[in-house]
């Protein structure tokens, strides 16, 4: 229901938008990130609190990102990995349900922890996480049905910590 309302805020759809519902200072917020200004009238009408939505230009923040800079972060993600099938191509997608284990164990085929997932994403996307400040703040399973009736279960993991930019272009 809520996902559909967010998607309709960007019609006609031209680019991908990232969003999440977050708790900040004891209040629930919808945080959106997109290259387009959304039409939030449907969301306000259906779920609004009476307060007008606010938008901010993201460019000034992006301009401050440079190699070696450090940032506090909170990321709510669906950490997954794909198994390889008998033909050697991508098989099933699995949730990273293991929280942690020694790195040597984690590197075995078919193993991926929630901490290992964020480390691998960091490497691909131009940042490193401070292992001493990395925390899994919340783990939650979500279940819903697709219009076809197929049941879907997703694992949501909230990561918090400090990241350091290693490649500003890849990060942005």
Go through the PLM ranges and name each one.
Residues 1-172:
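RNA-interacting cores
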């Amino acid at each position: 229901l809520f996902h559909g309302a967010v998607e309709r805020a960007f019609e006609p759809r031209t680019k991908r938008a990232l969003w999440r519902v977050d708790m900040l200072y004891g209040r629930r917020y919808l945080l959106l990130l997109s290259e387009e200004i959304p039409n939030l009238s449907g969301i306000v009408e259906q779920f609004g609190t009476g307060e007008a939505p606010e938008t901010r230009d993201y460019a000034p923040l992006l301009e401050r990102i440079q190699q070696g800079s450090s940032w506090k972060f909170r990321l709510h993600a669906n950490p997954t990995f794909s198994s390889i099938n008998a033909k050697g191509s991508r098989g099933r997608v699995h949730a990273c349900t293991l929280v942690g284990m020694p790195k040597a164990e984690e590197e075995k085929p078919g193993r991926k922890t929630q901490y290992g997932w964020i480390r691998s994403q960091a490497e691909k996307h131009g940042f490193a996480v401070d292992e001493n400040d990395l925390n899994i703040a919340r783990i939650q399973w979500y279940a819903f049905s697709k219009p076809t009736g197929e049941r879907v279960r997703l694992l949501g993991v909230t990561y918090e910590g400090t990241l350091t930019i290693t490649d500003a272009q890849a990060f942005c």
